[in-house]
């Protein structure tokens, strides 16, 4: 049950706000496809400094309005993961206090950077604050998992190794790295990319010895070069099938790799790709070059990793 409909404005709680940071898969291994059809993954995840913003006005009827440059890409409001997460949490917590959500949408949709999952995670953090819950509350964790595979990692918005179908998170101290994110403004459906990968139910994709979970990652405070050396040994197993689904992803990667980046790769199931640079000046120069060549593309220059 979700409690709504407070009418006493003098006792109404103030609006609460959260940012929803873009999730970037620095590596992504598809371990295999389970008998239930889901894919087991292992991924090094970091978060970027580009965000959506979500506000909760407590006491109002549960609802969602979207604004901002990407609002029209969100689709039907009733299907939005923000409301899905709120309803699922309400099923698990009697008398959950919710309200009206307002989303300022800046991140591209169906882009491989977990925009919808980050929004849902921000909604759960807002509801936790409004109801005095810890983000470690088992009911909130269960809700995050049921809402979507990327939602648990987005609730914390901290660098980690994510395994399984998103349920296992191992924190990592990934340093802040100058980066450019590029999306060609072409949505890519995750199901289409996994279909192009073509694993059968029960089929493994990599051997146990290849799993990144067993890797000893650099310790806290290790230089960026140590991280880039290890990340460069990784890959995104969905990159090739995603390029078959949307060939423009190959062009995005080629342009990023032509800018002198230390590491370039696709995030998630695409189409967003990222590149990491030696310094901010190199990142800004690369972003400006790509914007001039492809003004219709979404380009963000900023930071990957580091603190929240």
From Swiss-Prot:
List the GO biological process terms: isopentenyl diphosphate biosynthetic process, methylerythritol 4-phosphate pathway; terpenoid biosynthetic process
One GO molecular function term of this record is: ATP binding
Active-site residues from the entry? 23, 150
The record's Pfam families line, in alphabetical order, gives: GHMP_kinases_C, GHMP_kinases_N
Q: Per its UniProt entry, what is the enzyme's top EC class, as one word?
A: transferase
Where on this chain does ATP bind? Answer: 108-118
Alphabetical UniProt keywords? ATP-binding, Isoprene biosynthesis, Kinase, Nucleotide-binding, Transferase
Q: What is its EC number?
A: 2.7.1.148
Q: In which pathway does it act?
A: Isoprenoid biosynthesis; isopentenyl diphosphate biosynthesis via DXP pathway; isopentenyl diphosphate from 1-deoxy-D-xylulose 5-phosphate: step 3/6
Q: What is this protein called?
A: 4-diphosphocytidyl-2-C-methyl-D-erythritol kinase
Organism source for this protein? Nitrobacter winogradskyi (strain ATCC 25391 / DSM 10237 / CIP 104748 / NCIMB 11846 / Nb-255)
Instruction: Supply the source organism's classification.
Output: Bacteria, Pseudomonadati, Pseudomonadota, Alphaproteobacteria, Hyphomicrobiales
